[in-house]
Amino acid sequence: MKFSFVYGLTGFLAATSSALPSEILSTGYERSALEKRGDGYLIMCKNCDPNTGSCDWKQNWNTCVGIGANVHWMVTGGSTDGKQGCATIWEGSGCVGRSTTMCCPANTCCNINTGFYIRSYRRVE
């Protein structure tokens, strides 16, 4: 069962993988823009409740962390304009190589459900 899931997700990553704009990957640029705007932050959750938005711990911006099964993420705080929070998910042992981007509407729980790594960011148009 696990092998089939990983194989399917690998195919999904291969099909949706795309290069990110260099400014998104630049930690200093993105962090300074986020600080100036102050329009939300990404939350990494276990047992995320979509009704209350409750969650176990907050993930810092532009930080590479390993995540396990049934880990959820959401965007909360000052994001009442309907903008999405996005996370980049890498396949492998760190935030390098092939990746895909997943986005989640503000204050909504979105299930990643993978054993891959994540590095969070918020798009700054």
Curated annotation (Swiss-Prot):
Subcellular location: Secreted
Activity under varying temperature: Thermostable.
Keywords: Cleavage on pair of basic residues, Disulfide bond, Secreted, Signal, Toxin
pH dependence: Stable over a wide pH range.
Gene3D superfamilies: 2.60.20.20
GO MF assignments: toxin activity
Keyword Secreted: yes
Primary role: This toxin kills sensitive strains of yeast. It inhibits beta-1,3-glucan synthesis.
Subunit structure as annotated in this protein's UniProt entry: Monomer.
Name this protein carries in UniProt: Killer toxin HM-1
Species assigned in the record: Cyberlindnera mrakii
Gene: HMK
